[in-house]
From Swiss-Prot:
EC supergroup of this enzyme: hydrolase
Protein name listed in UniProt: Tubulin alpha-8 chain
UniProt record similarity statement: Belongs to the tubulin family.
Binding site for Mg(2+): E71
Record note on domains: The MREC motif may be critical for tubulin autoregulation.
Free-text tissue specificity from the UniProt record: Expressed at highest levels in the testis, followed by skeletal and heart muscle. Expressed at low levels in the developing brain.
Record note on quaternary structure: Dimer of alpha and beta chains. A typical microtubule is a hollow water-filled tube with an outer diameter of 25 nm and an inner diameter of 15 nM. Alpha-beta heterodimers associate head-to-tail to form protofilaments running lengthwise along the microtubule wall with the beta-tubulin subunit facing the microtubule plus end conferring a structural polarity. Microtubules usually have 13 protofilaments but different protofilament numbers can be found in some organisms and specialized cells.
Gene (UniProt): Tuba8
Lineage: Eukaryota, Metazoa, Chordata, Craniata, Vertebrata
Signal peptide start and end residues: none
Note: This tubulin does not have a C-terminal tyrosine; however, its C-terminal phenylalanine residue can be cleaved.
Amino acid sequence: MRECISVHVGQAGVQIGNACWELFCLEHGIQADGTFGTQASKINDDDSFTTFFSETGNGKHVPRAVMVDLEPTVVDEVRAGTYRQLFHPEQLITGKEDAANNYARGHYTVGKESIDLVLDRIRKLTDACSGLQGFLIFHSFGGGTGSGFTSLLMERLSLDYGKKSKLEFAIYPAPQVSTAVVEPYNSILTTHTTLEHSDCAFMVDNEAIYDICRRNLDIERPTYTNLNRLISQIVSSITASLRFDGALNVDLTEFQTNLVPYPRIHFPLVTYAPIISAEKAYHEQLSVAEITSSCFEPNSQMVKCDPRHGKYMACCMLYRGDVVPKDVNVAIAAIKTKRTIQFVDWCPTGFKVGINYQPPTVVPGGDLAKVQRAVCMLSNTTAIAEAWARLDHKFDLMYAKRAFVHWYVGEGMEEGEFSEAREDLAALEKDYEEVGTDSFEEENEGEEF
């Protein structure tokens, strides 16, 4: 089997983990204590779900996951929560002191103490796999554990499991709302350190999700639970093809092959449709054409940026539910004609489609309506460079005054790492710019020399 191991790091990673495993359990008919419910045999017509769950001798299903935080409170909620019996106690790892929003604490001082234990637990999980295909790593860019510890973990996973894929689900600091002043520092340091270790990183921007909750779901004051349930739907759509049989089965490496044209350009933009509340869904016919079209609306995106200003390099449409290839082809043809979608000239075809016949599941009492079909679009577009530019600008404002830098240096970091990381991100912005320029322009330039 092609198993995937999920690693949830820091508060954001663990809380998203809660939402995701709650949803996965519902989708596979697994109850809170890990046993199969009455519907399970109907849903899991084969054993594809074992990519995410392992089965014990007495019929319990245990997530192939590890939750790590350098301070105990968030993971303690899992230990005492509804799904406390789902996880093996050793899968929930906590330290005693937190990283205090400081990358250097997560990566050097505090993180160093936990890393071997975490790798040891991950090793136990990988030993139980017959054909490990890779890791899914959930974390935030802004927190100390999410940024520092994750980048340390990624480095070590690369050492221990060289060729295995590592996909990240990363929470990008929102342009307006911020949970920590030093988010830009942490984000840029972690991006620099993990850039060469991550194969593909799906970024989710808190503010974009706040807006979706307000606009599409009519939630006036969205809580983290609202945000995480929405994020878990996206994670579920991306991983559905690994957990269910479909007409087009995508494994982790297939994502990279289709979405990542150059190793560094591995930040696809995620869009999901339909995001709609139950009251509205009742009055709308969400046809394949409609949901496909709404994927190209900037306000269904998980990161604030405008694809109309950028060019697409690749585009993956992952449909689930009552969808047939004919409808999809018609919908995509319509979009190609009417939308202002610009592909880079060196990548003419552009659309890859996956269809999964398992309809989307919703958490009972959640915000999303139960729909017959949904689509998740992963597109690699040069527009996402806007997100980096925003972050770099904030970094520059603080770093020009060397504000807060002493906290990092005090934890054993060198100031040179800041400028090194910043240069790497400047190079990343440049890479995006170059990828978007047309190839025939470059040919003409070459003749002058």
